[in-house]
Amino acid sequence: MSSAVMTPPTVGASAMTDPFGRTISYLRVSITDRCDFRCVYCMSEDMTFLPRADLLTLEELDRLCSAFIARGVRKLRLTGGEPLVRRNMMSLVRSLSRHLGTGALDELTLTTNGSQLARFAEELSDCGVRRINVSLDTLDPGKFRAITRWGDLDRVLAGIEAARAAGLAVKINAVALKNINEDEIPSLMQWAHGLGMGLTLIEVMPLGEIGEGRIDQYVPLSLVRARLSNNYTLTDLPDSTGGPARYVRVDETGGKLGFITPLTHNFCESCNRVRITCTGTLHTCLGQEDASDLRRPLRASPDDDLLNAAIDRAIGHKPKGHDFIIDRKHNRPSIGRHMSVTGG
């Protein structure tokens, strides 16, 4: 980032509360739609990415995030695509970390595929990042190559080790895929818990065309949990995060296991989050086509008055819940945009 002076947050800006009384305190920002993997459940192999000129600059992303922090966001997650492939992205992390220092922000974190972690883990830790999520669906090199199409498992594992060595807490996110990795979930859990890492399982989400039918990938996590219960003691944990995951403690490993089930059990009633794309589009719901342009008001004025008005309008229309569905009759994705654009 350049040394340009950022617009200071509006002092005393009001909190963001939607029509259903949910206060927005968690912002997820996709800083790029590009990725060095082509995961089969996320995008097609010949994915066409956005022109670079369409993306917000790092300075604009900083200003946008800061405006939301001034409105009550306490947790900020940077996503992609793969956030660590964006040029100079660490300058954005370093700049945003000032909000940790002032106490305006409780947590600055990111979700990554791990491919670039060995390069950036130490710097992330130095910037005040304390924990990260790593997307990893298998420990089998052949399956990993098949799922990611372009990925190198050894490089990801080295990145995870570098993150742990830098003092970052790591949580593994794994998408459960029918007839691909569902049989490997117990061993993936044992591996993660053995290293002191949590594991969260995620159902396939119907976002964007991927060149394959998602019904052939989908396995309900209720079935996965039932299978695990045959060999492990799963004790429900209280919901303390306000997020989409439902957690259990696995008595035999002492580790924590999460289930994100948008299709079999939605998580809308306690939703406290919104998403911003790398082009400045605000999505107040992952599973709806709602969209509000924040780039125009961001660029229209050096102060945040127009931006805050646009944010208020968008939050005022946040829907009660999503419309995710996967079945043979509805084989097209429920939502046209890709997760890589929305932010994973």
Curated annotation (Swiss-Prot):
S-adenosyl-L-methionine binds at Y41, G81, S135, M205. Its cofactor is [4Fe-4S] cluster. It comes from Rhodopseudomonas palustris (strain BisB5). Pathway: Cofactor biosynthesis; molybdopterin biosynthesis. GO terms for molecular function: 4 iron, 4 sulfur cluster binding; cyclic pyranopterin monophosphate synthase activity; GTP 3',8'-cyclase activity; GTP binding; metal ion binding; S-adenosyl-L-methionine binding. Keywords: 4Fe-4S, GTP-binding, Iron, Iron-sulfur, Lyase, Metal-binding, Molybdenum cofactor biosynthesis, Nucleotide-binding, S-adenosyl-L-methionine. Binds 2 [4Fe-4S] clusters. Binds 1 [4Fe-4S] cluster coordinated with 3 cysteines and an exchangeable S-adenosyl-L-methionine and 1 [4Fe-4S] cluster coordinated with 3 cysteines and the GTP-derived substrate. Its EC number is 4.1.99.22. It catalyses: GTP + AH2 + S-adenosyl-L-methionine = (8S)-3',8-cyclo-7,8-dihydroguanosine 5'-triphosphate + 5'-deoxyadenosine + L-methionine + A + H(+). The keyword Lyase applies. One of its GO terms (biological process) is Mo-molybdopterin cofactor biosynthetic process. Belongs to the radical SAM superfamily. MoaA family. [4Fe-4S] cluster 1 binds at C35, C39, C42. Residues 19-239 form the Radical SAM core domain. SUPFAM superfamilies: Radical SAM enzymes (SSF102114). The keyword 4Fe-4S applies. Catalyzes the cyclization of GTP to (8S)-3',8-cyclo-7,8-dihydroguanosine 5'-triphosphate. [4Fe-4S] cluster 2 binds at C268, C271, C285. GTP binds at R28, R77, T111, K171, R273, V274, R275. This is GTP 3',8-cyclase. Monomer and homodimer. PROSITE patterns: MOAA_NIFB_PQQE, RADICAL_SAM.
